[in-house]
């Protein structure tokens, strides 16, 4: 399956480049298998060849640490151990891509609402502070879900145009600016 995604990525790059215009030179994002940042998936990833130098960006998803950020049955407390795990994960992403001159974007990240805003604030500040130290850009997965159990990652209330958790947003900005 991983080889199939590698093949799809190469076909995507070839197809977009062949259409001409701005597509001949624009940046393109290519995912690992399932956009996973697991070490096995990353080691099986093959960056497509491209006719334009330095215009490919690897896209991965990282809900880390898993038991805090994504596991509905996991912990709601963000601990020093979680900071260490987050540091390790982001360093591995950097070592696999950024250190080799390959841009990488975390195209999805977030932490479930488990009625633990203070812990999510601490997590958000640390996540973006550490990611910034490795020059990794992150995109919050805002799926507009709020009133459900499970993957409720809404930050922006699209109906009222207000932030659902302004303190989390402020903490992430603090992490970026530290």
Residue ranges and their predicted role:
Residues 1-74, 91-112, 133-134:
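Active-site region of glycoside hydrolase catalytic domains
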Residues 1-7, 78-85, 118-119:
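Alpha-helix N-cap and loop-to-helix initiation/capping positions
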Residues 50-55, 78-84, 127-129, 162:
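Short, surface-exposed linear patches
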Residues 67-86, 160:
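Acidic/histidine-rich helix-loop elements
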Residues 86-177:
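Substrate-binding cleft of secreted/luminal carbohydrate-active enzymes
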